[in-house]
A protein has these predicted regions:
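Active-site helical microenvironments for divalent-metal-assisted chemistry
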Residues: 1-165
Length: 165
């Protein structure tokens, strides 16, 4: 294994440990956030994306699902990872859930390809759960959310592996 992969894997271990500790201390999402975040990060790693994208994928839910601050995240993982994670996080001051998603998708687009790649991997992983939803209204809302993301991100990431899957 070359030095770059070893460094990346060490950083991934640090991110997973940081996330697990934060979720244990303050996590307030009943979904299996840790496993979801690991799947997203490892998917991006296997696809050969850079360190900022992989770490951003591992940590993409940490700001909205724990009490971790932007400053703590920045101190541990740097400004680029922090900005990618912030772009992928809900603005909780927006009350309407659809508006929260639209705002997040727009911030991902503003940040650029790295944030959009992570959001695509996140949505792809979450889409595996749609089969367990029995409520037609929820299914329609989830499909609307996916279509909205596709529309906003197509131009930026349609040539990326994450888009093709």
């Amino acid at each position: 294994m070359n030095k770059i992969n070893t460094q990346l894997e060490n950083s991934m271990n640090s991110a997973i440990e940081f996330l697990a500790i934060a979720l244990n201390a303050t996590g307030h999402n009943s979904k299996p956030v840790l496993l979801h975040s690991i799947r997203v990060g490892f998917y991006l790693y296997k696809k050969g994306y850079n360190q900022d994208i992989v770490l951003g994928g591992l940590l993409h839910d940490i700001l909205e699902d724990t009490e971790t601050s932007i400053n703590d995240l920045n101190d541990k993982f740097g400004i680029r990872v922090t900005k990618i994670v912030a772009a992928n996080s809900f603005n909780t001051s927006i009350g309407d859930k659809t508006e929260q998603f639209q705002d997040m998708f727009n911030r991902c687009k503003e940040y650029g390809k790295e944030a959009l790649i992570i959001k695509a991997a996140d949505i792809m992983d979450n889409s595996n759960y749609i089969q367990f939803v029995n409520d037609k209204k929820t299914i329609n809302w989830l499909l609307f959310k996916m279509k909205s993301f596709i529309n906003i991100s197509r131009e930026e990431i349609e040539k990326e592996d994450v888009w093709k899957e």
